[in-house]
C-alpha cells in the first residue's frame, strides 16, 4: 500500500497543540475591515480551534500531523 499523502493546503493552515487539538486562524481578517467593529476584529485575532465534528475529516487530510 502506498504512503498516505498530507493535504498541503491544510498542513499550512493548521497546527497541532500539545493536547492534540488543531489550532487555526479566523477568516475575514484581510480586507474590508472598516465596517467591522474593533471588538469583532480583536476577537478575530484570537486563536480558533477545529470543532470536534470536523476532527475526523481533518485527520484524513493530515495523517502525520
UniProtKB/Swiss-Prot annotation:
Biological process according to GO: translation
Recorded hits in InterPro entries, A to Z, give: Ribosomal_bL35 (IPR001706), Ribosomal_bL35-like (IPR021137), Ribosomal_bL35_CS (IPR018265), Ribosomal_bL35_sf (IPR037229)
Show the segment(s) annotated as Disordered: 1-23
Molecular function, one GO term: structural constituent of ribosome
Gene Ontology cellular-component terms for this entry are: cytosolic large ribosomal subunit
- Kindly give the PROSITE patterns that the UniProt entry links to this protein: RIBOSOMAL_L35 (PS00936)
> Could you tell me the keywords of this UniProt record?
Ribonucleoprotein, Ribosomal protein
**Transmembrane region(s):** none
PANTHER family recorded? 54S RIBOSOMAL PROTEIN BL35M, LARGE RIBOSOMAL SUBUNIT PROTEIN BL35M
Question: NCBIfam families per the record?
Answer: rpmI_bact
The Swiss-Prot or TrEMBL record describes its family as follows:
Belongs to the bacterial ribosomal protein bL35 family.
* Protein name in the entry: Large ribosomal subunit protein bL35
Coding gene?
rpmI
